[in-house]
Design a protein with these regions (language model features):
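Glycine/threonine-rich flexible loop motifs
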Residues: 134-143, 171-172, 197-201
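Catalytic-core regions built around general acid/base machinery
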Residues: 140-155, 177-185
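Short beta-strand/loop segments at the ligand-binding rim of alpha/beta enzyme cores
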Residues: 156-163
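Conserved N-terminal subdomain of the carbohydrate kinase-like
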Residues: 48-132, 157
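Active-site beta-loop-alpha junctions enriched in small/polar residues
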Residues: 105, 133, 164-168, 194, ...
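Structural recognition of alpha->loop->beta junctions
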Residues: 73, 173-198
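Conserved phosphate-binding/catalytic region of the ribokinase-like
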Residues: 1-3, 150-154, 201-249
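Glycine-rich phosphate/adenosyl-contacting loop at the front of the ribokinase-like
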Residues: 1-73, 247-249
Length: 249
């Protein structure tokens, strides 16, 4: 089984200690991104996985490529010489809490278009994993996402769609319409309970999962935070799946 994960990654600066960002003397440099996080997790489980996106031809872009490859992820990227890799700053105002600021306007990832995709690799993959973040970044990234889904649908590649709503990027109404369009062409849909309500208008997990299935996918997973998830797959209600406990890292 091979997987392609499509979506933007960002350079990440994390405050080295708890406190207001302007009072923290040092920050740790890394990177983050919903789709590349999935890619890393799969690679650690031994699954062949490719991360596909567009990066700035800069130090952050090179850092992201290098660290992904160090994790065993194949990076199918194109480099933009005129746009930067996006950046996010993460502060820890109190123990157990965090706040994130994004600097992604005009980023290389926001300039992604269908021409930057390795369509052949998508067609050859078993699974294409996407999120709603890509659709929110602009017309070019949305067109790229649509082209990737078209290629997957045409070749029998399973489409995994995690809603991953970002309210800072677009309005609820615009997002909900786009999510329904994408979900209708996906095979598996993941959504938090608040995202599932945005997508379907339903409030209970079982009703949310059923309404997602009605859009077209065969599997729906409604994420319930510490309580786990509610899953509906191929007509069978798997019901509540317990969550696993963890700790901040």
């Amino acid at each position: 089984m091979s997987v392609v994960a499509l979506g933007e990654s960002l350079g990440l600066l994390v405050a080295s200690r708890i406190g207001r960002l302007e009072l923290v003397p040092t920050m740790d440099l890394g990177f983050g991104g919903a789709e590349s996080n999935v890619a890393i997790g799969l690679a650690r489980l031994g699954v062949p996985v490719t991360w596909m996106s567009r990066l700035g031809d800069d130090a952050l872009g090179r850092l992201i490529e290098r660290q992904l490859r160090a994790e065993g992820v194949s990076a199918a990227t194109t480099l933009d010489p005129t746009a930067p890799t996006a950046l996010m700053l993460k502060e820890r105002p109190a123990a157990g809490s965090s706040a994130v600021s994004y600097y992604r306007a005009g980023s290389a990832g926001s300039r992604l278009t269908p021409e930057h995709l390795d369509i052949a690799r998508i067609r050859e993959a078993r699974i294409l994993h996407i999120t709603g973040i890509t659709a929110a970044l602009g017309a070019g990234p949305r067109a790229a996402l649509d082209a990737a889904v078209d290629a997957a649908n045409d070749s029998g590649t399973i489409v995994s769609f995690d809603v991953n709503h970002r309210s800072r990027l677009w309005s609820h109404a615009t997002a909900a319409f786009a999510y329904r369009e994408i979900a209708a062409r996906a095979d598996v849909v993941f959504a938090g309970d608040d995202e599932a309500e945005l997508l379907t208008g339903e409030r209970e997990p079982a009703a949310q999962a059923a309404a997602i299935i009605d859009l077209g996918p065969t599997q729906a997973i409604v994420k319930l935070g510490a309580e786990g998830a509610y899953a509906l797959a191929d007509g069978d209600a798997l019901g509540d799946v317990a969550g696993l406990s963890g700790h901040d890292v």
